[in-house]
Amino acid sequence: MTTRSISVHQDISTASWRSFWQKAAALFLREGQLLGRDVFRDAGCPVGTASRAEDLRVDGRGCEDYRCAEVETDVVSNTSGSARVKLGETDILVGIKAEMGTPKLEKPDEGYLEFFVDCSSNSPELEGRGGEELGTDIANTLYRVFSCENSVDLKSLCINPKEHCWVLYVDVLLLECGGNIFDAISIAVKAALFNTRIPKVRVLEDEEGTKEIELSDDPYDCIRLNVDEVPCIVTLSKIGYRHVVDATLQEEACSLASLLISVTSKGAISSMKKVGKGSLDPESIFEMMETGQRVGKSLHIALQKILDEEENLGTSRPKVGFLG
């Protein structure tokens, strides 16, 4: 992701700025809250100021730059697959457990995924009911993202149609919240799915027609999931006239509205969701969609490169885990 810096200088009189802030304050007092209104636009902010045009944020990143991310797989021993992702101050742990279950009536020849999200007490701001509501919101978002038929090959999880299938229980643990949790969680889920290994099974039938399931004892005789079409979430936060990716907590506090876009490795958008009390005009939405597709493709490439490198290292790769 390339950092771009554009400097625009324009002389603005003190009287002009005073008039602008007076109008902005009047809007706050009249509305009580923003309610989707772009205060900077309605108050008549002078056009062409440096804050509108510069591709520079407080921490030195460009508007389309992510913070440094650390990805590690196979960090929990008693799971079928696991991953830990640290994105800035945000810390996510995902564990996947494959268990046998019964296929759903509407899809008798497919397995399925179940998502559970726990907001750790290590994040004081997420204690109590607030954490429960956030966990439910994250789980519902993941269900929506993975509702696309091509995201995961669920037919490969079927053992015996209408009778047995693999159910993947995806447990998401939010260890620390430092902004942009949806993107970090989607990265961790994809990495954990890549790391998941499901034992191969054989269906044996005796003379009486009774079926038995036999699991392979060989740890290398397993099924690997194809994660090429698993989408990643790109959250774009609208701040003033611009939108940024991978917002920090401070930037999220300044944003009136954000757009969550799930993007595949080919840049296709599989779902979208607006969060926040503010509104987004059509032009901004189209710009954010284009940015999400562009940034999403780069994110997939970078993540897949890391996953492939870890895969090639095999057992020789150094493990950091929770003691690093």
Regions found by a protein language model. Name each.
Residues 2-324:
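Polyanion-binding surfaces on beta-sheet-dominated domains and ring/shell assemblies
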